[in-house]
Amino acid sequence: MSSGKIAQVVGPVVDVVFASGDKLPEINNALIVYKNGDKSQKVVLEVTLELGDGLVRTIAMESTDGLTRGLEVLDTGRAISVPVGKDTLGRVFNVLGDAIDLEEPFAEDAERQPIHKKAPSFDELSTSSEILETGIKVIDLLAPYLKGGKVGLFGGAGVGKTVLIQELIHNIAQEHGGISVFTGVGERTREGNDLYWEMKESGVIEKTAMVFGQMNEPPGARMRVALTGLTIAEYFRDVEGQDVLLFIDNIFRFTQAGSEVSALLGRMPSAVGYQPTLATEMGQLQERITSTKKGSVTSIQAIYVPADDYTDPAPATAFAHLDSTTNLERKLTQMGIYPAVDPLASSSRALTPEIVGDEHYEVATEVQRVLQRYRELQDIIAILGMDELSDEEKTLVGRARRIQFFLSQNFNVAETFTGQPGSYVPVEETVRGFKEILDGKHDQIPEDAFRMVGGIEDVIAKAEKMNY
């Protein structure tokens, strides 16, 4: 194990000099330094540049407070490695794979794997087309998720990305019993804490491994924590042969951390100040999130859209890798429609007759047609009023409004805030409900009865309570 000494510390960037003749650490190797020689105060550094003359530049995974020039640095000879396997379920880790949940310390001899790996080769990949039922009507009907696919949840600040992710974890664990890996990348510590305790109370935590690198962490930790979560998920796929759900909240923070690191390393910025290696870094992460012949990793990624600008390079780069997009719209939150999924902007390559079936496809496309026509008529209604519409258009507007409200539903994870029990709606029931609305079977039921309910039976029951 070769050793060097700290030459300079600039925030999270640490330069380490090795004696001439010593073997230099390789790129991505983990180096260890102890603050003031105290073994309990370990800081892990990752090699990012070799500057020549025995000097390497590293990024710290933890705070560099207390590091001084001249401290001894040890080369571990390998990349950062994290625990994998069934023992990770129910536990919470940081970027280095250290347990941070105050439970029993993780076994020293536990199996570990490096966070830097190559993506599976072409001949290992699987191309199945099976739908993953979420129990959320608007998603299952209009932008269904593929098992083993990549899903992006796009939205600005405060439109409900994290709540939607929490509901998906809840539904998939309760209804499918699947294993989930939740990766918190640069988000609020409070949200991570709330999620952990909610999952513990509901028992979902037993099927979930959680990895956090939150907002207060150095950029190196926020950039690498997504790889830590992915490594845990890959083990379940490749060794255990399981179908795994990988939740990443938020993939934008991964890009943001990469941008900070890039600037600290002195690289020339590209468009909007992002790192020149943006597409490469995103590709290296996304290409590892895939399905093989052994198992699948279905990833659901929350993607913050800065200032609601979808042309920003960070969300635009993520778009290229996705099978389904779920776009959250602020106007819908203002109307009190949750989840605030835009039914016309959201899309999925799974919405074809070959994958979802003819009836589902026909109902979904008709729902989109009705909503699109309603959107076109809204300008006329705003200027001239409903009276100027033909009878046919008035009927269409009534059905469109019922559809719009029926796309909302209460969430199980939001029950503590709303006081309303959440609902899980199977796909067949969702398709049947919307087909009945399109056929005009419920034209007499007041629009308010369709708001924040589960299946069509719930609408009828709510209408009876309203004494319509």
UniProtKB/Swiss-Prot annotation:
Tell me the keywords, alphabetical order: ATP synthesis, ATP-binding, Cell membrane, CF(1), Hydrogen ion transport, Ion transport, Membrane, Nucleotide-binding, Translocase, Transport
Which residues are noted in the entry as ATP-binding? G155, G156, A157, G158, V159, G160, K161, T162
Q: How does it sit in the membrane?
A: Peripheral membrane protein
> Where, subcellularly, is it found?
Cell membrane
Give the reaction(s) catalysed.
ATP + H2O + 4 H(+)(in) = ADP + phosphate + 5 H(+)(out)
Which InterPro entries has this protein been placed in? Answer: AAA+_ATPase (IPR003593), ATP-synt_VA_C (IPR055190), ATP_synth_F1_bsu (IPR005722), ATPase_a/bsu_AS (IPR020003), ATPase_alpha/beta_chains (IPR050053), ATPase_F1/V1/A1_a/bsu_N (IPR004100), ATPase_F1/V1/A1_a/bsu_N_sf (IPR036121), ATPase_F1/V1/A1_a/bsu_nucl-bd (IPR000194)
- What general EC class does the enzyme of this chain belong to? translocase
Chief subcellular location:
membrane
**Mind listing the GO molecular function terms for this protein?**
ATP binding; ATP hydrolysis activity; proton-transporting ATP synthase activity, rotational mechanism
Show the SUPFAM superfamilies listed in the entry. Answer: C-terminal domain of alpha and beta subunits of F1 ATP synthase, N-terminal domain of alpha and beta subunits of F1 ATP synthase, P-loop containing nucleoside triphosphate hydrolases
- Which EC number(s) does UniProt give? 7.1.2.2
A single GO CC term for this protein reads: proton-transporting ATP synthase complex
Function statement: Produces ATP from ADP in the presence of a proton gradient across the membrane. The catalytic sites are hosted primarily by the beta subunits.
User: What is the annotated quaternary arrangement, including any partners?
Assistant: F-type ATPases have 2 components, CF(1) - the catalytic core - and CF(0) - the membrane proton channel. CF(1) has five subunits: alpha(3), beta(3), gamma(1), delta(1), epsilon(1). CF(0) has three main subunits: a(1), b(2) and c(9-12). The alpha and beta chains form an alternating ring which encloses part of the gamma chain. CF(1) is attached to CF(0) by a central stalk formed by the gamma and epsilon chains, while a peripheral stalk is formed by the delta and b chains.
The entry assigns this protein to a family as follows:
Belongs to the ATPase alpha/beta chains family.
Q: What is this protein called?
A: ATP synthase subunit beta
Question: What organism is the protein native to?
Answer: Streptococcus agalactiae serotype III (strain NEM316)
Question: What is the gene called?
Answer: atpD
